[in-house]
Amino acid sequence: MKQPVRVAVTGAAGQIGYSLLFRIASGEMLGKDQPVILQLLEIPVEKAQQALKGVMMELDDCAFPLLAGMIGTDDPKVAFKDADYALLVGSRPRGPGMERADLLKVNGEIFIGQGQALNEVASRDVKVLVVGNPANTNAYIAMKSAPDLPAKNFTAMLRLDHNRALTQIAQKAGVAVADIEKLTVWGNHSPTMYADYRFATANGENLKDKINDAEWNKDVFLPTVGKRGAAIIEARGLSSAASAANAAIDHMRDWALGTNGKWVTMGIPSDGSYGIPEGVIYGVPVTCENGEYKRVEGLEIDEFSRERMDKTLQELEEERAAIADMLK
């Protein structure tokens, strides 16, 4: 058996946390031979701490062979101590009458604090995934608040958009999800994201040529993927928690264990390529190997794609401007 690794999860008693923790503890994220110690953070409110205790009782009751230990806390410095992986799931949801700018600021404070705590106590190789929305900007804030950690350690979750797009394309083209390669999602995890299947293939056949429907792409596919979260809230009365947890598992598993040359989408700090300013956390196609991600380079960007990529970049720039004074 390998040495246990430490996995920190924030918002651990929330809806996504509840869908996530049992799968991490069963080995779905890091492999069936990798023991884990779960370090679980919840807000310092009695109700949340009680709920966390209940979740930990259930985790105990599963008797997972790979669960080597657990702590529950309201202190980020305890939760992130020596963490090898950190899934930042907890964030403040948008309340009634709350402007997006207010939401950015409230979450800004949370992610400044968490970035500072990671900077102080986490493993220097910690892999950070921000799930809590607005994910890209929250990841940017955490990254900027952790100057002693490599910027590349901070990522945002675009995998839910990626997985949503996969299924829409599979259904449209009449192919199996598992057969689709080279799909990507550019930009922000928001309705402005740009899901791009120009390079996608299934069994060697180009899917753009197979689907061959620009109207469907613009008027059906992109809006369906972009507004899927809202559609689920409307149908279920609750946000998409299980599918978000599933995407987080996919993202971290691929980063840790590799993608065998397959493209996946991750929100990562830009290196200036594809016309995205350096440092902006932006969804791009990557492959993963030996615990590192590598962006897919040199893809051609056509006029429609440039327009969509710039639109989602503009939103990210606006978000960044809204919290700029907090990072001084």
Curated annotation (Swiss-Prot):
UniProt xrefs under PANTHER family: MALATE DEHYDROGENASE (PTHR23382)
GO MF annotation list: L-malate dehydrogenase (NAD+) activity
Active site: H189
Catalytic activity: (S)-malate + NAD(+) = oxaloacetate + NADH + H(+)
GO BP term, example: malate metabolic process
Organism: Acinetobacter baylyi (strain ATCC 33305 / BD413 / ADP1)
Residues engaged in binding substrate: R94, R100, N133, R164
Designated gene of the protein: mdh
Gene3D superfamilies in UniProt: Lactate dehydrogenase/glycoside hydrolase, family 4, C-terminal, NAD(P)-binding Rossmann-like Domain
CDD domains listed in its UniProt record: MDH_chloroplast-like
Annotated family: Belongs to the LDH/MDH superfamily. MDH type 2 family.
EC number: 1.1.1.37
Lineage: superkingdom: Bacteria
Protein name: Malate dehydrogenase
Residues reported in the UniProt entry to bind NAD(+): G11, A12, A13, G14, Q15, I16, G17, N107, Q114, V131, G132, N133
Keywords attached to this entry: NAD, Oxidoreductase, Tricarboxylic acid cycle
InterPro entries (UniProt xref): L-lactate/malate_DH, Lactate/malate_DH_C, Lactate/malate_DH_N, Lactate_DH/Glyco_Ohase_4_C, Malate_DH_type2, NAD(P)-bd_dom_sf
Function: Catalyzes the reversible oxidation of malate to oxaloacetate.
Keyword Oxidoreductase: yes
